[in-house]
């Protein structure tokens, strides 16, 4: 492998070591670039069962093994209280209100790039922090810093980082954002890092491998109600609207209906007032399609957002193809977004993230859907 000429001698970077391959290679690449690198392992959740405890202990063990191999220090910090207050309680409140939140986005905002950065600054005297996220930063000649999509389009994580401020991006380094995932694994293998073939973590960190509905039932009591067709026919019952999201197909328990065709059933709407789950047949059912949406709680990475009436692109969920759209501000905190073509399963509570080419501009929370 070609060595990288050190260019940043003396600058101190604290790398968020998760025990995975991406953070492992991030630490290695930054050392190659001449940074003074130390690791920091975050504990964000107090495990409530043996399996979760074992997984967290395994991650810490792997992070320590990588740091030992690289010859760098590994610090540990417990952010479980901050996570509970700023991420988990928000997650529960949104589900209780019938929306579908994205706790990973809130975790990045409140923990990985806020609590972590503050700890790295105040306790470890960092110049920068670094994470194993697949995004890039661009430093412009006018002194501004922008966040760009990762080179690996399949792994790009800018959707999860749109809440970062200009200042947070300027203090953060994203070495693996310049690489494809297979290159990251190759570097890890070549360097003899224990994480080179470790499976990527999936799902919400505090749920782990458990079934989502079982986990949610621990914190939110079931609220059974009817399942209806758009015409009002009752065809089943649900245990709680919070267990279902728009576009969901599995786990409805209503197959083989009389007088229905063979198309699968999808959740097409939720009637919060009546506690009714509305389902329709086919992935492009009219009730599942939106021509636009309103978006609030806006956040722009470079503080000034796109101009009124501009035509850019948006993602309404992770790994979605960009959707061309036109933006209109209804006030400084709310956008009306009209899609060029109707989009399926746009979900209130999820994030809408806007792009101008490679640049992630920022985004907000999907509030209301526009249909027809």
Swiss-Prot record:
Q: Where is this site: Interaction with tRNA?
A: 133, 350
Q: Where is this region: Interaction with tRNA?
A: 155-157, 317-318
Q: What biological-process terms (Gene Ontology) are attached?
A: tRNA wobble position uridine thiolation
Q: Which residues are annotated as active site? A: 107, 205
Q: Does the keyword Cell membrane apply?
A: no
Report residue spans for region: Interaction with target base in tRNA. 102-104
Checking Gene3D superfamilies in the record gives: Adenine nucleotide alpha hydrolases-like domains, HUPs, Translation factors
Known CDD domains for this protein? MnmA_TRMU-like (cd01998)
- Write down the EC number: 2.8.1.13
In Swiss-Prot or TrEMBL terms, this protein is called: tRNA-specific 2-thiouridylase MnmA
Source species: Shewanella putrefaciens (strain CN-32 / ATCC BAA-453)
The gene name on file is mnmA
